[in-house]
Regions:
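Short acidic/glycine-rich loops and adjacent helix/strand connectors
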Residues: 1-169
Length: 169
């Protein structure tokens, strides 16, 4: 029995989860980043600070005992696109790399956007769509943007994403 740790440190939420590969069950912990009343979001430096404080607390909740980790995954950027970068994702990346090295677990990176799509497929019992030849459409609503995405299963990257529509916000 092995487990996969997932970490996401977006500009809104600190998240971590454990996937039990034996039964595909998931335990997760998450905490919103504090935004002062009347403000619309956080500066990246503030998001990094809050993730640095919150992630160890959440990992302590998640790891109620010792787990045999086979892999550690993390979000490295908002999207899998040239120039897609936010410093807040460095916190999750650094923790994921440290845990991976300490446990001898594989290290896997993906985008925040792909993470949302995978979470949606998991929660509706449709992970089998990843092993199909058929493309599918997905809406990604996150961080003040709404995107209509064409998702094509890919053995190497899991999903190739092409934005085919979206909001102008």
């Amino acid at each position: 029995m092995s487990f996969v740790l997932g970490i996401d440190t977006s500009n809104y939420t600190t998240s971590c989860a454990l996937l039990d590969t034996a039964d595909m069950s998931v335990r997760s912990c998450k905490k919103l980043l504090p935004v002062k009343q009347g403000e619309r979001g956080l500066r990246q430096s503030d998001a990094v600070f809050h993730h640095t404080k919150q992630l160890p607390e959440l990992m302590k909740q998640l790891f109620d005992k010792r787990y045999d980790l086979s892999a550690v995954g993390y979000s490295y950027a908002p999207r899998c696109a040239e120039g897609s970068y936010m410093p807040c994702f460095l916190v999750g990346e650094n923790v994921a790399q440290a845990v991976s090295l300490a446990c001898g677990a594989d290290l896997e990176k993906t985008s925040h956007q792909v993470g949302h799509i995978l979470a949606a497929l998991y929660s509706c019992g449709k992970l089998d769509m990843l092993s199909s030849d058929k493309p599918f459409a997905a809406f990604h609503v996150s961080g003040g943007t709404t995107d209509l995405l064409l998702c094509e299963p890919d053995k190497a990257k899991l999903i190739n994403i092409t934005q085919i529509g979206g909001s102008r916000d």
